[in-house]
Amino acid sequence: MDEQDRKTALRMIPYGLYVMTAEAKGSAPAAATVNWVTQTSFVPPLLAIGVKTDSGVYAATKASGHFVLNILGKGQQGAAFTFFKPAELEDGKLSGEEITWANNGAPILKSAPAAVECQVVEIVEKGDHHTFIAEVTGVHINKHPEGRPDEAVLEMKELGEKVFYGG
């Protein structure tokens, strides 16, 4: 298989951008920008999220068994870039972002249009990113979208011509 063709083809898959947050008992909250996300079931409502195994949010989610998927909206490129690096909790803010706490104990970004609380039901431990299969246990709408909900989501391509993840 041609390496460049593989990258090109896989980069044609569109992705939204999300900040996944989790907090394991006795640890600081962790957060990371993620984009390999999809809904996989209506009943029960399930999501699948690919997460890099050496990330803090991976460790916190695996230890706690739950997380929040904060859905970034149009214009939130700054938040996406912020959580490309490890998060820090300072003065009640997570890497400068105001937060509140979900019922499952993970942080919710107040600036995110929506956040989804999830309970991990399975971890597929294959590849350099493991896949969390998780049931949606709660939702928080901070800003109702005008028009189609899927058009309100920040997409990878909106981070610039040279920003890719995948391939």
Ranges and model annotations:
Residues 1-167:
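Basic, polyanion-binding surface patches
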